[in-house]
């Protein structure tokens, strides 16, 4: 149902073109900021066609387009750009209001530029619209070309896929494991026999639910 999706790491990508056009005089800083403002507003008006069951879970039809930003490259250079500031600055627009899109995720490190850290703190206090993850932890597992794939889960951009299972029915899964893949209510064998061996009280003992 498209519960959440990655918007990738776009600040540095946009920044290359902004800098080129600023230097050539094609755009002004106001134009660059307006482009980012418009992107954020467009991300907020996207709506997915979803099942009624999904709509019953969440109000407001969020889709959590996660925009990853900041952090460091493996070569030690910060990945904070002018557009990183522009993105946060968009959140100061009075008419924008709170919203889950874009789901801005800052790859945090104490060594990030001081001005950027202070700006993040100010915007966080004013809007509660930013989440933070450890840049060090992400780079140690997925490298510096990583982004949040879902709401909070990192992956290598363009190289990995993530299957979203945050709403798995744990109680049902446990019953399947106990019953060898047979549905308790319908009697249907939903998992091929032999894939999961059912629990046998005489051999495995009684399940202690405590």
List the predicted regions and their residue ranges.
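Conserved catalytic cores of very large enzyme subunits
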Residues: 1-210
């Amino acid at each position: 149902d498209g519960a959440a999706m990655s918007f990738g790491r776009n600040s540095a990508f946009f920044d290359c073109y902004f800098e080129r056009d600023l230097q050539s005089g094609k755009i002004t800083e106001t134009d660059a900021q307006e482009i980012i403002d418009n992107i954020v507003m467009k991300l907020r008006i996207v709506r997915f066609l979803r099942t009624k069951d999904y709509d019953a879970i969440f109000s407001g039809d969020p889709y959590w387009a996660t925009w990853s930003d900041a952090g460091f490259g493996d070569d030690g250079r910060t990945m904070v750009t002018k557009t990183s500031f522009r993105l946060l600055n968009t959140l100061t627009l009075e008419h924008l209001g709170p919203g889950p899109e874009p789901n801005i995720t800052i790859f945090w490190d104490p060594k990030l530029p001081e001005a950027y850290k202070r700006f993040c703190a100010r915007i966080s206090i004013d809007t509660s619209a930013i989440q933070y993850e450890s840049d060090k932890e992400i780079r140690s597992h997925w490298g510096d070309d990583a982004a949040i794939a879902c709401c909070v889960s990192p992956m290598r951009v363009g190289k990995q896929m993530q299957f979203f299972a945050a709403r798995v029915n744990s109680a049902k899964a446990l019953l399947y494991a106990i019953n060898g893949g047979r549905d308790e209510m319908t009697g249907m064998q939903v998992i091929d026999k032999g894939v999961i061996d059912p629990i046998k009280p005489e051999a495995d003992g009684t399940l202690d639910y405590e």
